[in-house]
Amino acid sequence: MNTPSARIAVVIPCFRVREQVLDVIAAIGPEVGWIFAVDDACPEHSGRWIEEHCRDPRVKVLRHEVNQGVGGAVMTGYRAALETASEVIVKIEGDGQMDPAL
C-alpha cells in the first residue's frame, strides 16, 4: 500500500453497486496503492456502505451531493488520484462487470 512500487490508482464510480463493490475492492491486487470509490449521490449510499464494511486502508470514499453521472464520478476520482504519487490511473466498474485483477 502506497509503497514506491505501488504507483497505480484505481477509480470506482459507485451508483447502485452496493451488492458488488466490496467484492470488486477485495479483488484489487497489491500493485495498487490507492483506491478511490466515488459515491455519485447513490440512493443505496454505496459510499457509507464501503466505509462501514471495507477495512482496506487504500480505499478513500469521495462523495457527490448531486448525481453527476459516471463521467462526473470518474473525473472526481481522477482529480483525487492526480494528487497522489500514482503514475497510472485505472477506472474499474463497481458492479463486477470488469476483472479488477491487474
Question: Positions of the model-derived regions?
Answer:
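Structured catalytic core of nucleotide-sugar glycosyltransferases
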Residues: 1-102
